[in-house]
From Swiss-Prot:
Regulation: Allosterically activated by GTP, when glutamine is the substrate; GTP has no effect on the reaction when ammonia is the substrate. The allosteric effector GTP functions by stabilizing the protein conformation that binds the tetrahedral intermediate(s) formed during glutamine hydrolysis. Inhibited by the product CTP, via allosteric rather than competitive inhibition.
Keyword line: ATP-binding, Glutamine amidotransferase, Ligase, Magnesium, Metal-binding, Nucleotide-binding, Pyrimidine biosynthesis
Binding residue positions for L-glutamine: 353, 381-384, 404, 471
Organism: Acinetobacter baumannii (strain ATCC 17978 / DSM 105126 / CIP 53.77 / LMG 1025 / NCDC KC755 / 5377)
Subunit organization: Homotetramer.
Note in the entry: CTPSs have evolved a hybrid strategy for distinguishing between UTP and CTP. The overlapping regions of the product feedback inhibitory and substrate sites recognize a common feature in both compounds, the triphosphate moiety. To differentiate isosteric substrate and product pyrimidine rings, an additional pocket far from the expected kinase/ligase catalytic site, specifically recognizes the cytosine and ribose portions of the product inhibitor.
Name of the protein: CTP synthase
Gene Ontology CC: cytosol
InterPro entries: Class_I_gatase-like, CTP_synthase, CTP_synthase_N, GATASE, GATase1_CTP_Synthase, P-loop_NTPase
EC numbers for this chain: 6.3.4.2
Binding site for ATP: 14-19, 71, 239-241
Lineage, highest ranks first: Bacteria, Pseudomonadati, Pseudomonadota, Gammaproteobacteria, Moraxellales
Binding of Mg(2+), residues: 71, 140
Family designation: Belongs to the CTP synthase family.
A single GO BP: 'de novo' CTP biosynthetic process
């Protein structure tokens, strides 16, 4: 029987609902419970797949190929025993699309389709389905309490809490405790009004997570409890931390897991063992020295656009006991600049992306890394550009390009994938006229790594599974020419023999991959490719001293 914890936010947005929810999930998992998580997004887009990274940040790809909110990345990084799927994230757009499709088919037998019950029932069905087979499902509602867009979701939560009952549901509400310097005190009124907003729609919070920059004394906690109908021990302080990976320990010290287990009747559970989290924090806060990675992209003004890459580099730093400083380099600006901005880098990374804008700057950075022996990692578009750069400057194809940028190029090193097998083994077909949304090669795919290559050595095995999100792929017609020039194809897809990884054997560390390894990195386990990349950056750092 699944128990549900609903997570809402009030006062302001960006309080960290996702991180707080994931930290609670990690704590419950450490008690031996089977935990999953769900994110409900109120926007009308069907999914974030076609949204600008400047609008939404990163699109996180699940194993089964769902394009989801970046919060699902937090969920997977904090949980070890649960992988997110397309069931774990849905939007208002997805719900309305589903309901309208049913109406067009006549499923409602001519009845009037309304927000209540049709939309709310659809939301409830999705929540219950996502929670099947788990002890606890933690469900985050995007946005802020009081937003008009989230009202159907809040009503669905209210109904579920009534239908499932007190012993199977809880609500955790995040609020802000602002500090007024002129008065030298924390203000509780915004929290009171936020809870009042919840009460007005029939929902009583059970736990309050109070975000603050300062310590909160017992009197303030009692005051908050008095005005919000919450137990004083359920007023949890979440003070700004040096790293988000300290938060599970902070919640444990305030007995958040005990509150939940008591409510749900979970007895005879072991104490939470947070040793792994303590080790992560210790390594993160006590690095031996700093290495610098230049990340060359076109969305660098918003680091959340590369959230999983940033986190994977952080995790690799933990594994190597170094601090990884990311220097963001605007690819467009680099096109008109010299490469001096890259000279302080111990390693260079070109992440995934779409479109022609900034590609010449990225290839400029790739050429610099290749010619100067700087460790280089290319991801998705970064791999495609590494192949094009090599073809232009080494393999004698100066007009080499991708059909994404130039359909009439003389040397189409990169072309549209027209056919491939999806994660279910079913044939997928695409053309240049296909819709942009949901038409990519998505999700986990198997690859075979070539024996004797550095990539095979890094992974330590012949077959790997990594997640994909792309429409274009290296053109197999040019494999022979590229390999004769010195670049090695080090990995192929198991099903279609598509190029998955390339490397330059004569270079100290030059690997580029078509997939997205960042999606499977975690703070406790890291990822072999990123760990090896940062190890190479350490070697480069020592050489340059």
């Amino acid at each position: 029987m699944t128990h549900f914890i609903f997570v809402t936010g009030g006062v302001v947005s960006s309080l960290g609902k996702g991180i707080s929810a994931a930290s609670v999930a990690a704590l419950l998992e450490a008690r031996g419970l089977k935990v999953t998580m769900v994110k409900m997004d109120p926007y009308i887009n069907v999914d974030p797949g076609t949204m600008s990274p400047f609008q939404h940040g990163e699109v996180f790809v699940t194993e089964d190929g769902a394009e989801t909110d970046l919060d699902l990345g937090y969920y997977e990084r904090f949980l070890r025993r649960a992988k997110m799927t397309k069931l774990n994230n849905f939007t208002s757009g997805r719900v309305y699309q589903d309901v309208l499709n049913k109406e067009r088919r006549g499923d409602y037998l001519g009845g009037t389709v309304q927000v209540i019950p049709h939309i709310t029932d659809n939301i409830k069905e999705r929540v219950l389905r996502a929670g099947e087979g788990y002890d606890v499902a933690i469900v985050e509602i995007g946005g802020t309490v009081g937003d008009i867009e989230s009202l159907p979701f809040m009503e669905s939560v209210r109904q579920l809490m009534v239908e499932l009952g007190h012993k199977r549901t809880m609500l955790m509400h995040l609020t802000l405790l602002p500090y007024i310097k002129s008065a030298a005190e924390l203000k509780t009124k915004p929290t009171q009004h936020s809870v009042k907003e919840l009460l007005s729609i029939g929902i009583q919070p059970d736990i309050l997570i109070c975000r603050t920059e300062y310590d909160v004394d017992a009197d303030t906690k009692r005051k908050i409890a008095l005005f919000t109908n919450v137990e004083a021990r359920a007023v949890v302080v979440c003070k700004d931390a040096k790293t988000i990976y300290q938060i599970p320990r902070g919640f444990y010290e305030q007995n958040v897991d005990d509150l939940i287990c008591e409510r749900f009747g979970f007895t005879d559970l072991p104490e939470a063992d947070l040793t792994d989290w303590d080790n992560v924090v210790e390594a993160l806060l006590n690095p031996e020295y700093t290495v610098r990675v230049a990340m060359v992209g076109k969305y660098v003004e918003l680091p959340d656009a590369y959230k999983s890459v940033n986190e994977a580099l952080l995790h690799a730093g933990i594994k190597n006991r170094v601090k990884v400083q990311i220097d963001y380099v605007n690819a467009e600006e680099l096109e008109s600049q010299d490469v001096s901005i890259l000279k302080t880098a111990d390693a260079i990374l070109v992440p995934g992306g779409f479109g022609e804008r900034g590609t010449e700057g990225k290839m400029k950075a790739i050429q610099y890394a290749r010619e100067n022996g700087i460790p280089f990692l290319g991801i998705c578009l970064g791999m495609q550009l590494a192949v094009i750069e090599y073809a232009r400057h080494v393999a004698g194809m100066p007009e080499a390009s991708s059909t994404e940028f130039n359909r009439s190029t003389k040397y189409p090193l990169i072309g549209l994938i027209t056919e491939w097998l999806d994660e279910r083994g079913e044939l997928q077909q695409r053309s240049l006229e296909s819709d942009l949304g949901g038409t990519m090669r998505l999700g986990a795919q198997k690859s075979e790594l070539v024996e004797g290559t550095k990539t095979r050595e890094v992974y330590g095995k012949a077959e790997i599974t990594e997640r994909h999100r792309h429409r274009y792929e290296m053109n197999n017609r040019f494999i022979e020419a590229i390999e004769q020039a010195g670049m090695k194809i080090s990995g192929y897809s198991s099903a279609q023999h598509l190029v998955e990884t390339v490397e330059i054997p004569e270079h100290p560390w030059f690997i580029a991959v078509q997939f997205h390894p960042e999606f499977t990195s975690s703070p406790r386990d890291g990822h072999p490719l990123f760990a090896s990349f940062i190890d190479a950056a350490k070697t480069q750092h020592q050489k340059s001293k």
